[in-house]
Amino acid sequence: MTFKLEELPSELLWLILEYIPPMDLFRTFFNLNQRFNKILRLLHYRFNLSCINRNQFNYFLNTILPSIEHNWIESLYIDDISDRIYSISTFKSLQSLTIHHLRTENIVSLANDILVELKKLNSLRLYSEFELQERDINSLMIVIFSQRMPSLEYCYLGFQDHGYVGFDGLDSINQTLSLKKLIIDRWCRIRDFIRLLHFIPNITHLTIRLFDLNVKGPFVQSLNTINDFTTLVPNLIYLRAKLAEIPFEIATKILFLRLPSNLRELSLSTWSIGYGNGDSWKSLLSSKFPYLKHFRLIISLDRIPQNYLVASIADLDNIAKSFNQSKYFLDHHWNVLINVNDHDRLKFVLHTVQYPIENFQTTLYDTRHCTMSLSMMKSAYHHVSKLSLTLFDERISSSANLTENRYFPNLNQLTFLSNIRNEYPEYSPDEYFNDLKSMINLSTITCINFAEENHHYPNKLVNLLLKSLPKLHTLIIPYRLYTCLETQSICNLKILTLIFAAYSSISPPATRMRDILTRHQILTNDLILELLQTLFSSFPDIQTLTLTVRGLDGFDSQFSEWLKANLSMERNIAYDLLLPDKILQFYF
């Protein structure tokens, strides 16, 4: 039975069309007839403008926006490139806003000119991989943690590790009353964390990274002014924290014992084996948190702890027994799994099951585990969306050493680290790839990252992988490896990052540089022009090309002038030069 879509009642059409991505919706139905135009004008829209090129963005600005009611735009995802974020101020009724690639020079304007005008904004997510100035972040904090954003209930701040965040500029009188869920993915000192609690009185869910190098002696006394955080955040029921340089005994005194007793979930990650005593946790949790439903713990170490035996499964079971043989933990179904691998950069990982956060690092082979049921092992990593795998030299038989029963079904980002020391190791890419497919669902991956410019990756393995990633739109790769790619397998790529060891304004580079590096490790002006001329033939949907230098030399003082002279707007390519990050970005 067939029918024409336009024969459906308007109410049903309305519901159907709202499920179609807006860009596709307009290209299909706009100006088809007056009825469709009227429906398109009054739909509720959720625009995802991430990973679109300039022509697509211009279509959004010049065709879609004039044809719809701006008050019906509920949600917006956008990249901070080519001043695109300034279009946000048009959408006064926006309820949800996500910005990727936020740059420090736009933060103050975003905070003071854009966010304060979005009085209905309920959800805000900001992401940046760049170096952000502390004064700019402070300007943002002053707006977010105040009544200038009266409807904001959810806020995610995901910034790069170039420093820590403080809250010295916040106004105690003008504190936010609406904020319920807050995630700050940046390091924060304990004393700044306590200060933050004064400005978020209605918070229920809080995620933070905490550190302090001076938590002993007189400093601890300075933190003792408030004995119970319940007076500051009485509704807090969820805390997730990454802890660094804070011993378990100190964290218990200045953090855990001060938390509200009605906490429902406590999720912690640390690099200290001092947090690995189940008896200590039982004593704390059972006495302090009677309503706790979920306890999550991750301990990640780059070396095996001293005096710990890890040669056999029995050794690992012995380490985990204070958790896995405790009646308290068994009654709550809080099991602990231990992974040990001498080849990995993280050699010892203890975590509760299921693994509680989105990031996980491991190897494909030779990982030893404590005893765990097959079904529990199979489902342990359901929440992992970002996986890092370490490659190493030795060729290991998969039948004997494959990390059986672990499975990662929901990845969107896969990063390869390399401990391969030889350019041509004794290695079987085909065997590795086949084993990889049994552990990872490749069909969901959108981003793949070969992050280390000065390390070796097997070319054949890289090409096998790229052929098997149907949703891939982002690739981060050293240029010397990029030159070996079979690019026809990734023709739908939208974001490409090429990594170099050095930049040279001279082509060919100086002899000194060529003696140290290969020509494919050096970014030159001629190579930049060549990439811009040839990129579209390989990737017709490309939106962003990023060139980053991670080694000997960055961009010199004359480079900015060269860009202006050689990349006029006639090329229809915009660009940004981020000197502190040694990054050059082109937008198509």
Spans of features found by a protein language model:
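Eukaryote-biased activation of long, low-complexity terminal tails and linkers
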Residues: 1-588
